């Protein structure tokens, strides 16, 4: 379960981890930030500063009987002065935590930048970042979440900009749907390179924005929206996916409902 499901103004990381474990999840996905933040340090919310000792954070996660599936480290790849140091540190941090993946996307591309210009800069960013990923054996999980990555053809272009066994896929089922794409076709096209999945369902008021947005931060409980989880799991199993379904939802209640539904789906043949 992604820790973004816990949206409180007065709860530290430990609160989220305790709730995740109590709900029956075995893995958590942590949200990373750089620099120091007083509110975070004081325990008002559960993001993790990458200036903190990662082994200290790992010990905290371990104490709740959890493992870290991935770190969420979205960075604007078309702005290498930001994304290269941020993603480099996220890779190092993920390795220390025992995670296998850094989840990110291409970020918001400035309106004045053409696609060709953006892809040239993103290529440079990836050429700098992927050698670090290869040394640490951490996957860069490209997530569909911005204007290029939410469309299958340009997602594949981004995915193949730099050849590396650690340039991989972290599909977000809800974002793909909200962008007006076919999530099942999308998954089938990238299935062999999927290392981590954002399990996000979509329903309710956001449905009216389909085709107008590049995704949503979080969805409804898995099984309470429009996505066919049996079909999604079938695609993943056919590709011999062995990674983690990291639920992204909007509340603790949705987290409980999601794991209940997904367990039923996973137990079915």
Would you name each region that the model predicts?
Residues 39-43, 81-83, 114-117, 153-155, ...:
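Short secondary-structure transition/capping segments
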Residues 15, 21, 55-56, 60-67, ...:
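Active-site acidic/histidine proton-transfer and metal-coordination neighborhood
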Residues 5, 47-48, 72-81, 220-223:
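The substrate-binding groove and active-site-proximal loops of carbohydrate-active enzymes
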Residues 38-45, 74, 107, 210-217:
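Vicinal oxygen chelate
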Residues 29, 70, 103, 141, ...:
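Conserved beta-strand positions in the central sheet of alpha/beta enzyme cores
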Residues 29-56, 109-114:
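Glycine-rich, proline-tolerant flexible connector loops at the mouths of alpha/beta enzymes
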Residues 30-35, 73, 106-107, 145, ...:
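Active-site loop/turn elements of alpha/beta-hydrolase fold enzymes
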Residues 2-26, 62-64, 98, 149-269:
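Histidine-acidic metal/acid-base catalytic patches
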